[in-house]
Amino acid sequence: NGVLLAEYAKALKEAGLDSVNVSLDTLDETEFQRLTGRDELNAVLAGINAAKEAQIPVKINTVHYQHLDWKSILDYTNRVQIPVRFIEMMPIGYGAAYTGGSNEELFRQIEECYGNVSEAGTVRSREGKKYSADIRDLSYTEEKQQSGKHGAGPAAYYRFPGLNMDVGFISAMHHKFCRSCNRIRLTSEGYLKLCLCYEKGIDLRAVLRDPGRKQTLQEVMKEAIFEKPAEHCFEQVSEMTEHNAMVRIGG
């Protein structure tokens, strides 16, 4: 995504957009076209630059697939001073046919290249307490949000000595964070999904169009959220009920 961002960044800022995530899995044009089916890498990079110029905070999302050139991604994000999150491959849609890597192993490789996290000093949590990152645990904690400056999502953020921006890890496969998951997803068709692993959700568009409804939209959403599954079952693909590709799920 991000192909049209350069054209609309200024208007999006004026409309009130307060942040944007851009998917970027490679900086090689041939590999980009192989992954996306489109020769649009330069358009995406131009979009990222335009968002920065419009003063829209940007984060880069990079899926950790088998042949990921993570060093080029880190060198780029470090140069443009944008935080990056490495996301473990999930068995959703086409992702089920790919071999993903462990973020824990990637973490160690990054340390070998850019220095140990423990040598990067300390950062402060929202309460002002100092902490040191535990390299054995890439699951979400409030402290690993780096004072909340990157939002309240599931990424665990770290600062490596050789980099001047934060590196996040979203490790749904090897460090399940379902207990602290605070995410729901609203699709372009008005469907509220409670978990990427399951089809279950609620059609908010139908609720809005029901002239006889007795509940407010907020009440309906609250009830749905309390039905959020306890955890995903990505490790047991046969139990998944969501079979659409991410491009179809959207949201």
Predicted regions and their residues:
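Radical SAM/AdoMet-radical enzyme domain recognition
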Residues: N1-I87
